Amino acid sequence: MLDVTLIVLCAGNSTRFEHKTKKQWIRIDNEPLWLNVTKRLASFSNFAKIIVASHEDELNYMRNFTDDFAFVKGGDTRQKSILNSLQFVTTKYVMISDVARACIPQSVIENLLEQKESADCIVPVLNVTDTVIYETNTINRDEVKLIQTPQLSLTSTLKKALDTTIEFTDESSAIKAINGTIKYIQGSNESKKLTLGNELDELPCLKEPSKNFFTGTGFDIHAFEDNKVMFLGGLKLPYDYGFKAHSDGDVLIHSIIDALLGACGAGDIGEFFPDTDLKYKGIDSKLLLEHIVRFIYNVGYEIVNIDTTIIAQKPKINPFKHEIKNSLAALLNIEKQFINVKATTAEKMGFIGRAEGVAVQSIATLKYYNWKQK
């Protein structure tokens, strides 16, 4: 086994990507890009450890995909993500790559590893073939290099180099700043960094997402409580009683949230918004749903449709169905024709039949966001 740890940085917000989904979560067949890239790099050599640095909101979800990697909370900059990851590195060397470089060839990895003892940092580069002008001066293009990742560094030197408040854009710049030794090796055009959405077609190693559909169910039930405002589907209903709950008690929204989370395999509402957390006390459930919808899109899905059944002896739901559908369509960012709201009673049986509360059953269908068609 190599005395080398591989770190893959996946904590970015994809602000320049111009797609609904973060670049690290676009699907390559059935795999998110971060998993596809990390497995690809892992297959090229026998690394001692593989660390994936991710956005805090996505860490637990990532763990659903594999137990083969360690997951670390990333920072709000590339350098902070590296620093967080380095706390868990005990090997002599560390190789750091960006998830946005999806098609790195095996030859680059092998060359980096072969040269690991020749300098403090080994860096793949490309030469410039076009004329280069800085302001009004023509620069000798033979002196210009395009720096790529992954880069392989001596762990102790990199830790020392990053012990600073100065932000660097790559490891070699930090190591060079403390007079560490740098060795440049030949990079590859295949290691192109994915930044803008229209660059996806320039990465031939990426397959289009599968056309699978994913279905989840959600169920919630709440008792009535007098002298509270009733919220249902994001609407305020004209009654002098509402739902007993830690939040505002919107039983319909809670059911839909669980259905959405079930469809993408992300757990349940309590894992995202625990009722032991005071910041969710009395919270508007529309905010919870908006958070989950953003999460759904961020991690690579689109909402296909929602079907929901409200089980209530009271209040009567039919007068509000149209408004509920409009409210949900706006919250879910889908057309209302893809939302169905049904209502039934419990035929005066049990808790619901005695008009003590309401239950809701929801079904959500998702599909992968198809970046090939955008």
Whereabouts are the PLM-identified features?
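SAM-dependent methyltransferases
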Residues: 1-7, 11, 40, 170-172, ...
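N-terminal glycine-rich phosphate-binding loop and ensuing alpha1 helix
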Residues: 2-57
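Conserved N-terminal catalytic core of the sugar/cofactor nucleotidyltransferase
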Residues: 33-91
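Conserved core of the sugar-phosphate nucleotidyltransferase
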Residues: 44, 104-186
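Short aromatic/hydrophobic "clamp" motif used to bind/position activated sugar donors
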Residues: 94
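RNase III-family endoribonuclease catalytic core
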Residues: 204-322
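Short, conserved loop-to-beta-strand elements that form functional interface hotspots
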Residues: 307-316, 321-352
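C-terminal edge-of-domain segments
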Residues: 353-373
